Amino acid sequence: ELEPGTPISQVVKADTLVEVEVTPNRPDLLSHNGMAYELAAISGRGYRPVSIDDAGVALEPAGDFVRLDQPELNPYYTAVKISGVKVQESPEWLKECLVAVGLRPINNIVDITNFVLHELGTPLHAFDAAKVQGGIVTRTAYEGETIKALDGQEYTLNCTDLVVADQSGKALAIGGVMGGEESGVTDATTDIILESAWFKPSSVRATSRRLALSSDSSYRFERGTSAWNVLRGSVRAVELILQLAGGTASPTYVAGSPVPNPAHASMPSCGGADGPVSVFASLKQGKGATVTNELGFVQLPWKALDQISGGSISHEEGARILTALGLKQVPDSPECWLIPPHRLDLTRPCDLLEEIVRVFGLDGIPSRFSGPFVAESPVDAAYNFQMELRRKLAALGFYETQ
């Protein structure tokens, strides 16, 4: 529809590319949602969270549909079966979002999983349900077991690699790294199983390095993802799939339970509460079980902020910064802070101090001595005498020899 010679600027929308160097301790920044928290705190503008309607989500114990044979490597797994989907090309807005972050659109199902990965930082995978016999089993691979991954390459696994398989024993995916080509979504797919899970970082890292196979999912899993996001990512993806591909969704089948950050789980009581608490709504699984997202406390004495900043940062500004970063003050305990589950790196008072000073900016803290007087030692006096003597002798024409 365009005439030859049409300027590219009239076809491609203007955009701004921002490259961010993310340190290994900040996996929360590997998503637009996490980056929004950061920008809100630095700019002082409000944070608008992604709207996820989880009020009507039905959770059920997975039972025989999902079996975790290696819970130390994969303690938490959720699956949703969506029947009657129409696999087709994604709408323009979705394709534009993926192209903007350097991804190639494939189809609406795969594109949605990639979109949620970058939006929330939750790795997801969709299986063609017709290629899955029985249910899902996560286990370690058999020695010498092979799988052809989505990149078209065949990989030989060993007994330390985690795989997602079906109940016939066939490997469907390399856990946390990449899905298998045979069970992938195609244009002929009508029913899918959506996976959202938490895999042990060290396991994913070891498999990814040994196979020389990296993906956007493994990049996040090996740095540590929040168990809090497992359910949120699934709910968000199901919502988009029903909108763009149609179909009917089953309840969310849950196997295992979220693993809280070990450092948070070991924190002492604070603000009158004992141990970690849940501030994310508990959702009924049935049979009395609940899915919760555990948070930890960090006690931050404001006098520590006064000492490190020399009084340059007010308590109110410190509280504003922490609140903008997603932390919450415990009622009636202004020095006690609830850590958001996506901030796995905040476990000590010094971590909170670092966040405040980093966002406030070191340039805003004036350099000055801690007191009006500087003590002088005998060593200083001897050095000063030697230097003065050298200057006087040099002025008289003498040369110093060593």
Residue ranges with predicted function:
Residues 1-261, 291-362, 366-382, 387-394:
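RNA/tRNA-interacting regions in translation and RNA-turnover enzymes
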Residues 105, 399-402:
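Structured aminoacyl-transfer and RNA-binding surfaces used for tRNA recognition/handling
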Residues 257-291:
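Intrinsic disorder/low-complexity segments
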Residues 284-287, 326, 397:
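Generic low-complexity, intrinsically disordered sequence content enriched
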Residues 44-48, 272, 400:
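Cys/His-rich finger/ribbon microdomains and the adjacent scaffold used
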